Amino acid sequence: MHFPIVALIGRYQDTGLDAPLRALAAMLTQAGRRVLVDADTARNTAVHEYPVATMQEIGESASLAVVMGGDGTVLGVARHLAPYGVPLIGINHGRLGFITDIPLQDAHDALARVLDGNFQIEERMLLQGSVWRGDALMYTASALNDVVLNRAGRGGMIEMRVELDGVYMYTQRADGLIIATPTGSTAYALSANGPLLHPGLNAMVLVPVAPQSLSNRPIVIPDTGVLNMTLTAIGRVETGASAHFDMQTWSDLQLGDRITVQRAPHTARLVHPQGYSFFSTLRRKLHWNQMPQVSDNIE
């Protein structure tokens, strides 16, 4: 039997999840699977009929996690479950949904195909970022999308010295710097004019945010190296910069802090129904292949 124990995880404080979660749980039970409900999801919904499990318990016992929400929900769950190797499938109950690629209305059909063995598993790399103050480790966290260094809300530009494996790359003045995985190349990095990276690439991309020099451009580097960014100037206020991990956890930065970023030891395992295509997702989400329409209206 494929995936005998299935965990259901919903977006935090989403008030519209009760009915679709119950329907999925009933469908899974009818298919002979044991259903667990994430503890936070159970607290935030009225779905109390099934065994409740913490994220750690899900990691230790579940064979599949079904995540209902947006991409942000999947990011958080993926970081928690990656060390356990539990695969997850995303049901889109958010907006854009690059990672939660299954529409809510198709959830039952897609899950039925997966339970029947018609699925593929995709390994997605994570980043591990650490903040150092002298020799002291101040903060460390993983990220599926990106690690972002940026100026504080009241601060000006920040300046950082960037090295790869101890080799000097450049010094940059900008509002920020995005270090993104292939998964993250469709997120914040894309809005900052970064390139799209195929998820099969073993690479990460550095994308400047509003750089002072117009010659600054994104650069793709191998995922085997260790990036080292030293904060050499901050703008106008003492706590003028911060490091963000998937924009969900963060650390304040001080002048002279050093931030290291490298590939994390674990991967996120994403389950897709057989026939999934990254390019199909791009076409749908970015509206490729839609030709301009001729209009007689004066704009």
Swiss-Prot record:
Enzyme class: transferase
Transmembrane residue ranges: none
GO cellular component: cytoplasm
Cofactor: a divalent metal cation
SUPFAM superfamilies registered for this protein in UniProt: NAD kinase/diacylglycerol kinase-like (SSF111331)
GO MF: ATP binding; metal ion binding; NAD binding; NAD+ kinase activity
Annotated Pfam families: NAD_kinase, NAD_kinase_C
Cross-referenced InterPro entries: ATP-NAD_kinase_N, ATP-NAD_kinase_PpnK-typ_C, NAD/diacylglycerol_kinase_sf, NADK
Subcellular location: Cytoplasm
Any one Gene Ontology BP term: NAD metabolic process
Keyword set, alphabetical order: ATP-binding, Cytoplasm, Kinase, NAD, NADP, Nucleotide-binding, Transferase
Active site feature: D71
UniProt-annotated binding residues for NAD(+): D71, G72, N145, D146, R173, D175, T186, A187, Y188, A189, L190, S191, A210, Q248
E.C. no: 2.7.1.23
Predominant location category: cytoplasm
Reaction(s) catalysed (UniProt annotation): NAD(+) + ATP = ADP + NADP(+) + H(+)
Disulfide feature: none
Family affiliation: Belongs to the NAD kinase family.
Biological role stated in the UniProt entry: Involved in the regulation of the intracellular balance of NAD and NADP, and is a key enzyme in the biosynthesis of NADP. Catalyzes specifically the phosphorylation on 2'-hydroxyl of the adenosine moiety of NAD to yield NADP.
Protein name (record): NAD kinase
Organism, scientific name: Bordetella avium (strain 197N)
Biological classification of the source: Bacteria, Pseudomonadati, Pseudomonadota, Betaproteobacteria, Burkholderiales
